[in-house]
Amino acid sequence: MAYTVEAAFNTLHENINLSGDHRDTANKRRDRIVELLKNQFTILEAFSAGSIPKYTALRGHADLDVIVALHYGKHVKDKLPSVVLQTVRDALGAYRTGARTNGQAVTLYYDTWPNVDIVPVSRVTDNNDTVTHYEVPNSRTETWIPSRPKDHAALIEEASKKCGHNFRRIIKMVKEWNRVHGDYLTGYHIEVLALKAFSSDLDDLPWQIFMFFDHAQKLVKERLWHQVSYVDDYLSVSSRAEAVKRLETAYTKSLSAWYATHGANKDHATAIGLWPIHLRKITRHSNQRTAAKSP
């Protein structure tokens, strides 16, 4: 049976997609964390964030963030980010915790999936006491990073409605590509790249994945501003160069792969072998499963 690029992409998405609605789990974990912290902190607000509630999560590599807005005067003022993070970790001393590699959260480990990254933040308000953004701790640089996680999540939802279901599919496929090609880009960075790249209906998945790499290879070369901060400040000079090199290779391969099945061209085998998102591996596994079922 012939295997097409469309079928390969569908199989890939099935393999990497975290299916189902996990908001109930996220909300329960959020409420439990507030319960654990409220005796030692004045918590002004807490909400779930990360790839799970945005439906951009990879199966087996999903993250759940719980943003906890602490009273600035009591818990944040005149304190280094590392100190604030440590006080949260100390408050959870009876539980197994760790520090997230980017230095912006305390990880609380659960017996069941998912673990939770607790991000203690302070709120910044205007003269009308309206929250303009949040300040996220970065213990690696001892700085506070401006962030608007709610607005970013809303932008993802708006883009998904405007561009169609392929918008989130592309994000997840690129996250998987990134994961197996050095993991140089954060998931948040990839989401922002998708927001910058797409603004209309995505009805041709192979072409639009090629276009993502076309946009991304250019955008990652320079600093990228989104909302209230640069999304790529975590990249060193060498890491940026490596990320760009991989994106340029993906761009070149994607163009050739797309052309192999464009118009009258029907060379699906060549296209599947060229696509940088490991479609050949997907088809090999699929064929093995089919063969195993044969008498």
Task: Give the role of each language-model region.
Residues 1-48, 53-61, 72-79, 83, ...:
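N-terminal regions immediately upstream of nucleotidyltransferase
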Residues 11-15, 39-42, 73-77, 91-94, ...:
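RecA-like P-loop NTPase motor core of helicase/translocase proteins
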Residues 32-41, 87-95, 173, 177, ...:
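Generic non-transmembrane alpha-helical segments
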Residues 46, 50, 97-101, 187:
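Short beta-strand
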Residues 47, 53-59, 70-74, 84-85, ...:
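Extracellular/secreted glycoprotein ectodomains characterized by long, lumenal stretches
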Residues 82-129:
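Conserved catalytic core of two-metal-ion nucleotidyltransferases
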Residues 133-174:
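A structural motif
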Residues 162-285:
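Conserved nucleotidyltransferase catalytic core and NTase-mimicking acidic/glycine-rich helix/loop elements
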